Amino acid sequence: MNQLEMKKLAAQAALQYVKADTIVGVGSGSTVNCFIEALGTIKDKIQGAVAASKESEELLRKQGIEVFNANDVSSLDIYVDGADEINPQKMMIKGGGAALTREKIVAALAKKFICIVDSSKQVDVLGSTFPLPVEVIPMARSQVGRKLVALGGSPEYREDVVTDNGNVILDVHNFSILNPVEMEKELNNVSGVVTNGIFALRGADVVIVGTPEGAKIID
């Protein structure tokens, strides 16, 4: 079974958490694209969705699913998103697709965060296999980069990428994130940082892992 098939298994399994007549929070990325496709099969059951990226908005509309603005909803029943890494405590690194800020906003609206991944995304320590994305106000890029170096990281400017919010991304290598909650707070306090890709303060409630043996649910 290849990686795409495992992603589809996890995405399909997430449908069991979708309740009738609700608005579903939807993240972004390749695994979420599989979920959007699956969500299209039950589009008449739901009111619609709030999307964390413009790309996800477009895909939802192609499926005939109404897209709501985050400002027009007070809460969401569930938020479904993928991860670049996830640890046993259900904390994640996200932002490979540069949608991390909007993902945090939509996740904060949800009563339940459901993370869908394939088994390659599971790690013991965050930062083991994937650099940490940090969204930065453009004029602060160099200043934030120096601060990240002082904290022990090796930031790399993600060239030719502008976020949906008009900002830039620094990918920080060589961070072994032993205390994700404290690291998330510390980085978010750096002037010029919009947010970083650690999802620890608001981690996942349920993790669905696509494996060669099927979808494994961790709650």
UniProtKB/Swiss-Prot annotation:
Annotated catalysed reactions: aldehydo-D-ribose 5-phosphate = D-ribulose 5-phosphate
EC number: 5.3.1.6
Any one GO BP annotation for this protein: D-ribose metabolic process
Binding site for substrate: S28, G29, S30, T31, D81, G82, A83, D84, K94, G95, G96, G97, K121
GO cellular component, one term: cytosol
Keywords: Isomerase
Active site: E103
Pathway named in the protein's UniProt entry: Carbohydrate degradation; pentose phosphate pathway; D-ribose 5-phosphate from D-ribulose 5-phosphate (non-oxidative stage): step 1/1
Enzyme class: isomerase
Any GO molecular function: ribose-5-phosphate isomerase activity
A Pfam match: Rib_5-P_isom_A
Task performed by this protein: Catalyzes the reversible conversion of ribose-5-phosphate to ribulose 5-phosphate.
PANTHER family according to UniProt: RIBOSE-5-PHOSPHATE ISOMERASE (PTHR11934:SF0)
Quaternary structure and interacting proteins, as annotated: Homodimer.
Family: Belongs to the ribose 5-phosphate isomerase family.
Name assigned to this protein: Ribose-5-phosphate isomerase A
